[in-house]
Design a protein with these regions (language model features):
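Short solvent-exposed loop/turn micro-motifs enriched in small/polar/acidic residues
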Residues: 17, 38-39, 72, 96-99
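Arg/Lys-rich, often Gly-containing low-complexity segments of ribosomal proteins
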Residues: 5-10, 38-39, 65-82, 107, ...
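Broad gene-expression machinery/nucleic-acid interaction feature
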Residues: 21, 26, 41-43, 55, ...
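Flexible glycine-/small-residue-rich
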Residues: 28, 48-50, 57, 116-120
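A positional/architectural concept
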Residues: 3-52
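Residue-level signature for short turns and capping positions that connect secondary-structure elements
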Residues: 21, 31, 46, 60-61, ...
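Beta-rich strand-turn-strand
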Residues: 80-117, 121-123
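Helix-adjacent hinge/juxtasegments
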Residues: 49-89
Length: 125
């Protein structure tokens, strides 16, 4: 397992509860840029729409050798999870006070994976 990027801010700002491993749908120039380590998870978050999971605001730098077919750096990317996992996350989010944050991006074999965690925000007052 080769770790590409970690979200250390999430460990500081949230109490992390449950961990899920999700595949991520990437374009050709995105995966080439990820292999070079040009990923930032700092301000990214996970959103669930119509029983599909998306990661938003995750920055993958444009590939240096990509021409007009290069990708948009902060586009919305679909995450690949089992239906049971999506339903479990959705039910816990409906209880309130929880969110889902990406904490780590890594390669499992040749596939890029994103570790997402169910989290509760910390109070600083």
């Amino acid at each position: 397992m080769k770790i590409i990027s970690q979200n250390k801010k999430a460990h500081h700002d949230y109490f992390l509860l449950d961990t899920y491993e999700a595949g991520i749908e990437l374009k050709g120039t995105e995966i080439k840029s990820v292999r070079l380590g040009n990923v930032n998870l700092k301000d990214s978050f996970v959103r669930i729409k119509n029983d599909e999971v998306y990661v938003e605001n995750m920055h993958i730098a444009p590939y240096d050798h990509g021409n007009i077919f290069n990708h948009e750096a902060r586009r919305t990317r679909k995450l690949l999870l089992h239906k049971k996992e999506i339903l479990k996350i959705t039910n816990k989010l409906k209880e309130g006070g929880l969110t889902v944050v990406p904490t780590k991006m890594y390669f499992s074999g040749s596939k890029a994976k994103l570790e997402i965690e169910l989290a509760k925000g910390k109070n600083y007052y």
